[in-house]
């Protein structure tokens, strides 16, 4: 969404059940016997012609295991997402998906990109008992401030969410050029202790693998009991 649509034909949403992105993910999941997460421009029936930016998780059997619509839509220069995407619905905005992986069950949240800047998102998922958040991301240079590198800020904010909410967070980001935007990659996985377990370079694609111990979430929240000592009576 690096340019404004000039006509409805510039918008190319897809059906979430059988569109090309999900079809690709289903094939990849079955062929490799893994879960595959993708994000796509979901087609919905709306009077304004907008769709949703939706994260989808496909199981190894090729079936859709989870999906979540992006809540927050940026209006920053060069990222014309509000011309394509509607805000995600406010009913059940933070769905938690229980996914069986090997011998463990993981409580998974699937917020998207701009959602990762908002502490309320990670906090709500943390309070609901999420173990892992996966933020599919497309962030890079700022066209109106090309000298400003936001990558360190992006990384710091997400790692901070992991610490404050006792979460594992995977933040895959694209790389390469599109229009005026240079996407700065740097995908990473962080743990509740604020450690970056693995990280990709800025300028090339990479496959990241990390082993996570879900018990570390409770270890961290026992050491720093943020949830137990909250004061929601003072927050409104």
Go through each PLM region and give its residues.
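Active-site catalytic loop in hydrolytic enzyme cores
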Residues: 14-17, 23, 27, 45-132, ...
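A short, hydrophobic beta-strand-centered structural micro-motif
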Residues: 16-43, 163-174
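Short beta-strand scaffold segments in enzyme catalytic cores
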Residues: 38-40, 53-57, 95-97, 187-189, ...
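C-terminal beta-strand edge segments of enzyme domains
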Residues: 88, 168-236
């Amino acid at each position: 969404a690096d340019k404004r649509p000039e006509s409805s034909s510039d918008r190319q949403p897809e059906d979430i059940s059988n569109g090309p992105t999900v079809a690709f993910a289903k094939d990849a999941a079955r062929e490799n016997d893994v879960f595959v997460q993708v994000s796509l421009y979901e087609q919905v029936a709306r009077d304004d012609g907008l769709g949703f930016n939706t994260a989808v998780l496909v199981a190894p059997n090729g079936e859709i295991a989870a999906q979540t619509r992006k809540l927050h839509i940026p209006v920053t220069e060069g990222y014309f997402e509000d011309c394509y995407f509607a805000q995600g619905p406010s009913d059940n905005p933070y769905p938690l998906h229980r996914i069986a992986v090997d011998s463990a069950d993981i409580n998974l949240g699937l917020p998207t990109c701009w959602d990762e800047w908002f502490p309320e998102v990670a906090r709500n998922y943390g309070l609901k008992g999420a173990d892992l958040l996966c933020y599919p991301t497309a962030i890079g240079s700022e066209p109106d401030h090309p000298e400003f590198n936001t990558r360190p800020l992006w990384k710091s904010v997400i790692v901070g969410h992991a610490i404050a909410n006792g979460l594992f967070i995977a933040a895959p980001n694209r790389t390469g050029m599109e229009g005026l935007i240079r996407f700065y990659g740097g995908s990473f996985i962080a743990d509740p202790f604020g450690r970056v377990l693995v990280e990709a370079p800025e300028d090339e694609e990479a496959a990241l693998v990390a082993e996570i111990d879900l018990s570390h979430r409770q270890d961290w929240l026992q050491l720093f009991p943020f949830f137990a000592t909250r004061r929601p009576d003072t927050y409104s």
